[in-house]
């Protein structure tokens, strides 16, 4: 009796292991960013298997609340029927997981190139960049210095007096500032020379600018002057804030709070970001596209002939399989199988009876369990196997009882020769077997072995054999008549 209790313990332990709901079951094709379904992605009845379809390039789309979803193809294979139907599902990544993945990606060094459209728009809107070491940084407000010409031109001294004070300038330039505006160096200070403007006649004038320093010796204001012709009279034509000058900004690293705030404010995930986010995200639910196509099997036909009446009875059995999805958009959706069988009986071509039966097969229940709270002083114990599997225990006990002597059945067994005999002749349903999915692990790929070409060849051979049989029958018939 100890054996069946050990069997009960193992069965109960297996049931308990299926109770706890885990993450979405996936597999990743090597060297890709594509999730594929596994046989445990969806709960199915024992006679149904979910097989992945080889797909390297992921199809990704947006879902509500700033999430992303990747489509995955598979096939539901019904064992007893040797047939399968295609099924499409989506591995869903919620907005919270996507944002966490974006943060991890931006924090990873060396990821400054090849970013997706959504992440690129985030960097543009938040004014963030990657530095040379691959770290995400932001410009320092108010920082930087004026951009000087790579090769400053030293101006010759020429002194004039104007309303703005005494300035050292030059009439001779290399290159001529009338054609090359930009920053120039004069007496060690940056000087801006703008474009030339025509003021009429043959006279021209151009602008000069000087940078005023603040108390700390930093440039903070720009004053412009103009030379109005041969009299070299200088006048103040206005000032410009240094903020409007071209500068080389200084950058500082982002804090975690700034990074999270920027992602919350500016980030709109794009399917193009999938390749960047993939190493940092995991799907948190799976959605099956419904309805799943029905499986309509070829009818099975059998016939019999009554030797006394000569009547021919034909029985036609048709079967269709429907799939019903429950717990969709969860960590492990369920698929139930509804199998409908219709049996029509014909006698000499007339329908005499019709019967339809439907069988529903559900996947094994995962069950529920509530572990004891910590500090309760009681340990979790598995229930007694025979307390919930009484029928199994009773049957096992019955098999252990000694077998009685074989009874004498000669009084109820007799040889009866005068019985009606029937003969069923069937050549099958002419249906082609379903493809067989072969997983080649060392190549990390799945191959569907199809029998379509063989079935087409068999169909051609069938007609050739039947034609040959008719010709042979005609030859035999003619030989008998002539003989």
UniProtKB/Swiss-Prot annotation:
Polar residues: compositionally biased ranges: 326-343
Leader peptide range in chain numbering: 1-20
GO biological process, one term: viral extrusion
Protein biosynthesis is among the record's keywords: no
Membrane topology reported for the UniProt record: Single-pass type I membrane protein
Source superkingdom: Viruses
Location in the cell: Virion; Host membrane
GO cellular component: host cell membrane; membrane; virion component
Parts of the chain that traverse the membrane: 460-480
InterPro entries documented for this protein: Neisseria_TspB
Predominant location category: virion
Chain positions covered by the region annotation Disordered: 324-343, 354-378
Pfam family, one: Neisseria_TspB
Keywords: Host membrane, Host-virus interaction, Membrane, Signal, Transmembrane, Transmembrane helix, Viral attachment to host adhesion receptor, Viral attachment to host cell, Viral attachment to host cell pilus, Viral attachment to host entry receptor, Viral extrusion, Viral penetration into host cytoplasm, Viral penetration into host cytoplasm via pilus retraction, Viral release from host cell, Virion, Virus entry into host cell
Function: Plays essential roles both in the penetration of the viral genome into the bacterial host via pilus retraction and in the extrusion process. During the initial step of infection, G3P mediates adsorption of the phage to its primary receptor, the tip of host type IV PAO pilus. Attachment of the phage causes pilus retraction bringing the viral particle into close proximity of the host cell inner membrane. Subsequent interaction with a secondary host entry receptor induces penetration of the viral DNA into the host cytoplasm.
Quaternary organization: Interacts with G6P; this interaction is required for proper integration of G3P and G6P into the virion. Interacts with G8P. Interacts with the tip of the host pilus.
Note: The strain Nijmegen sequence is shown.
The family this protein is said to belong to: Belongs to the inovirus G3P protein family.
UniProt xrefs under NCBIfam families: VF_TspB_C_term
Protein name as catalogued: Attachment protein G3P
Source species taxonomy: Viruses, Monodnaviria, Loebvirae, Hofneiviricota, Faserviricetes
């Amino acid at each position: 009796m100890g054996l069946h209790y050990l069997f009960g313990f193992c069965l109960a332990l297996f049931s308990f292991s299926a109770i706890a709901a885990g993450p979405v079951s996936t597999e990743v094709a090597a060297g890709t960013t594509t999730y594929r379904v596994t046989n445990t992605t969806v709960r199915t009845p024992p006679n149904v298997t979910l097989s992945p379809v080889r797909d390297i390039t992921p199809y990704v789309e947006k879902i509500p609340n700033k999430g992303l979803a990747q489509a995955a193809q598979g096939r539901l294979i019904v064992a007893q029927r040797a047939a399968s139907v295609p099924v499409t599902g989506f591995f869903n990544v919620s907005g919270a997981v996507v944002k966490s993945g974006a943060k991890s990606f931006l924090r990873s060094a060396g990821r400054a190139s090849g970013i997706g459209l959504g992440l690129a728009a985030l960097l543009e809107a938040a004014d963030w960049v990657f530095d040379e070491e691959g770290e995400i940084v932001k410009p320092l407000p108010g920082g930087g210095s004026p951009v000087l010409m790579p090769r400053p031109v030293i101006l010759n001294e020429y002194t004039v007096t104007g309303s703005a004070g005494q300035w050292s300038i030059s009439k001779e330039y290399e290159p001529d500032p009338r054609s090359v505006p930009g920053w120039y160096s004069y007496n060690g200070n940056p000087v801006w020379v703008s474009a030339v403007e025509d003021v009429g006649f043959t006279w021209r004038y151009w602008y000069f600018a000087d940078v005023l320093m603040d108390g700390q010796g930093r440039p903070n204001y720009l004053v412009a002057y103009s030379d109005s012709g041969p009299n070299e009279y200088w006048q103040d034509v206005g000032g410009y804030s240094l903020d409007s000058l071209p500068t080389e900004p200084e950058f500082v690293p982002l804090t975690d709070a700034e990074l999270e705030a920027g992602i919350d404010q500016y980030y709109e995930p794009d399917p193009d970001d999938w390749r960047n986010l993939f190493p940092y995200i995991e799907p948190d639910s799976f959605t099956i596209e419904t309805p799943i196509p029905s499986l309509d099997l070829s009818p099975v036909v059998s016939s019999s002939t009554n030797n006394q009446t000569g009547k021919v009875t034909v029985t036609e059995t048709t079967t269709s399989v429907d799939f019903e999805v429950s717990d969709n958009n969860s960590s492990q959706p369920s698929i139930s199988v509804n199998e409908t069988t219709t049996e029509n009986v014909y006698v000499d071509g007339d329908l005499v009876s019709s019967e339809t039966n439907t069988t529903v097969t559900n996947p094994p229940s995962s069950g529920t369990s509530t572990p004891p709270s910590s500090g309760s002083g009681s340990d979790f114990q598995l229930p007694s196997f025979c307390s919930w599997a009484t029928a199994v225990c009773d049957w096992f006990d019955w098999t252990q009882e000694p077998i009685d002597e074989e009874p004498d059945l000669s009084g109820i067994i007799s040889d009866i020769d005068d019985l009606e005999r029937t003969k069923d002749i069937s050549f099958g349903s002419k249906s082609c077997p379903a493809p067989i999915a072969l997983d080649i692990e060392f190549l990390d790929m799945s191959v569907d072995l199809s029998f379509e070409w063989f079935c087409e060849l068999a169909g051609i051979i069938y007609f050739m054999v039947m034609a040959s049989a008719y010709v042979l029958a005609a030859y035999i018939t003619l030989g008998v008549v002539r003989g």
